[in-house]
Amino acid sequence: MAIHLVIIDALNLIRRVHSAQPDPTDIANTIQNTCRTLQRIISESHPTHIVAVFDHLGSDRGWRAEILPEYKQGRKPMPEPLLNGLEKIQDAWWQLGIDSLLSEGDEADDLVATLACKVAQHGEKVTIISTDKGYCQLLSPTLQIRDYFQHRWLDQPFIEQEFGVKPQQLSDYWGLTGISSSQVTGIPGIGPKAAKEILSQFDDIEQAFLSPDLPKKYRTKFDQHIELARRCKRVSALKTDIELGFNLQDLRFTANETH
């Protein structure tokens, strides 16, 4: 039987469902609505294996903040009623046949990336359910990203239209432009248009920096800020080598079995 692993970016989904509610303290409604959303996702995607990956919620901002101290600094905390209701949400998802994987010190996106790439590299189909465009750098013939809320695939044509670069250049793109929502600055004075121009001429930041053909209008910026660009690229890239401690069989979708 062909394998299809569906990975739910859990907090990405939960926050969007919760923010649309009129009463943010009504966690029972959040549970009901997230379960309804997941049932539709399952109905549309027909997974053989499925898992929901959650961020750890400690004060440690992880390895990225060690490289770039301002990374995600000052980000709004999760609303307390929602934070207190996460365990109940996970229990409800378990009843649907969806187990939860909680990251411990690693960001959820690195866990998602590692799991997705390990399975996709064996030629099996993987779908990541998330609105996070950061996952687009993982795209491959067997790995796809679905933005459920916008009813669209974050695929190669989407990346071309949105960023004008190849999937494998996205971390370089963000190394140049930054990611404002995560306090990743990039090179001051280089925006999307300039990054697209640079990465249409060069494969990556290093090739551009070392080339005598880098346009003069960018040379001073690169010379002054190359180390910052390298750090921004590193924090924008997803890790795909985390030790997982389980195998694919543990994620088999068992909706019709008793939990």
UniProtKB/Swiss-Prot annotation:
It comes from the Bacteria. It is an enzyme of class 3 (hydrolase). Its EC number is 3.1.-.-. GO terms for molecular function: 5'-3' exonuclease activity; 5'-flap endonuclease activity; DNA binding; magnesium ion binding; potassium ion binding. Its cofactor is Mg(2+); K(+). Binds 2 Mg(2+) per subunit. Only one magnesium ion has a direct interaction with the protein, the other interactions are indirect. SUPFAM superfamilies: 5' to 3' exonuclease, C-terminal subdomain (SSF47807), PIN domain-like (SSF88723). Residues 189-194 are annotated as: Interaction with DNA. Coiled coil: none annotated. PANTHER family: 5'-3' EXONUCLEASE FAMILY PROTEIN (PTHR42646:SF2), FLAP ENDONUCLEASE XNI (PTHR42646). This is Flap endonuclease Xni. The lineage of its organism: Bacteria, Pseudomonadati, Pseudomonadota, Gammaproteobacteria, Vibrionales. The gene is xni.
